[in-house]
C-alpha cells in the first residue's frame, strides 16, 4: 500500500469518526456552506465576467459574445456553449492538455443547469432567423481547487451572465454586413439556476464538500434548481449510491440552500450594477 493510500485511509477514518459525532473536519454543520465571495467585472475585454471564492476554491468565468450561425434544428435560437479549463496551478491533479473527464463533466453540468432552466432567453439573441444569431461563450477557469467546483462554477457563471453587456447591432440586408452600435444592452437573463452539491461519506450526507471530504466520499450528487423550484439538472458522481429517501432529502435541501445562495448572488450582482 502506497503512502498516499495510507494517508487517505487515515483521513477517511478521521472524517467518518467526526461525522458520527455530528461534526465535520472544518467545524461546519452538515448543511453549512463555506464562506462565499463574488466579484464581477474582472476581465476588461470580456462582455461579462465574475470571480467566485467558495472556501479555498476559486473560479473565474468570462463571457464572450460573438455573431454566428444557429444550429440547423434551432434556427430561432441563439447559441450557448460552455468550456472549462482546469488550470494546472490550481491542483497537483490537474494537467495541461485537452479537457479531461472532470473538466468535461463540470462543463456539461453547468451548461445543462443553465440551458434547461432557460436562464438565458436564447430566442432573443436572433439577428436574422435561420442565418445569424448571437453566440454566447461561457469560459470557466478553475484557479484553486479546494472542493466543490460545481457550486463555485455555477455561481460564477450566473454572476458573469447576469452582468454581461452586449452591443446592439444592425443588419444590412443588401451587403449582409453586421454593424455594431455604440449602445449596449444586458444579456437577456430571466432565471437564476443554482447548483447545490452533496457528498455521501459512509451513511452521512453533507453539502459543499471541501477537498478532504471529496477525497474520501463514496458518492456525489449535484442538484440545480431555479427560483421557481424547477429542477434543471441532476448529476451523480463517484461509485456509491443514494437511497430514494436520501435523494428526496437532497432535493428538499437543495431548494433551501439554493435560495440562500441566490440571495448572495443577487446582492453581489446588484452591487455591481
From Swiss-Prot:
GO molecular function: mRNA 3'-UTR AU-rich region binding
Family in the record: Belongs to the RNase PH family. Rrp42 subfamily.
UniProt xrefs under Gene3D superfamilies: GHMP Kinase, N-terminal domain
UniProt-recorded name of the protein: Exosome complex component Rrp42
Complexes and interactors: Component of the archaeal exosome complex. Forms a hexameric ring-like arrangement composed of 3 Rrp41-Rrp42 heterodimers. The hexameric ring associates with a trimer of Rrp4 and/or Csl4 subunits.
Gene Ontology cellular component annotations, sorted alphabetically: cytoplasmic exosome (RNase complex)
Database matches in SUPFAM superfamilies: Ribonuclease PH domain 2-like, Ribosomal protein S5 domain 2-like
Gene Ontology biological-process entries: rRNA catabolic process
Role noted for this protein: Non-catalytic component of the exosome, which is a complex involved in RNA degradation. Contributes to the structuring of the Rrp41 active site.
Keyword Cytoplasm attributed: yes
InterPro entries: ExoRNase_PH_dom1, ExoRNase_PH_dom2, ExoRNase_PH_dom2_sf, Exosome_comp_Rrp42_subfam, PNPase/RNase_PH_dom_sf, Ribosomal_Su5_D2-typ_SF, Rrp42_archaea
Native source species: Thermococcus gammatolerans (strain DSM 15229 / JCM 11827 / EJ3)
Localization: Cytoplasm
PANTHER family the UniProt entry points to: EXOSOME COMPLEX COMPONENT RRP42 (PTHR11097:SF8), EXOSOME COMPLEX EXONUCLEASE RIBOSOMAL RNA PROCESSING PROTEIN (PTHR11097)
Keyword Membrane belongs to the record: no
Short name of one Pfam family: RNase_PH
Primary location group: cytoplasm
Keywords: Cytoplasm, Exosome
NCBIfam families: PRK04282.1-1
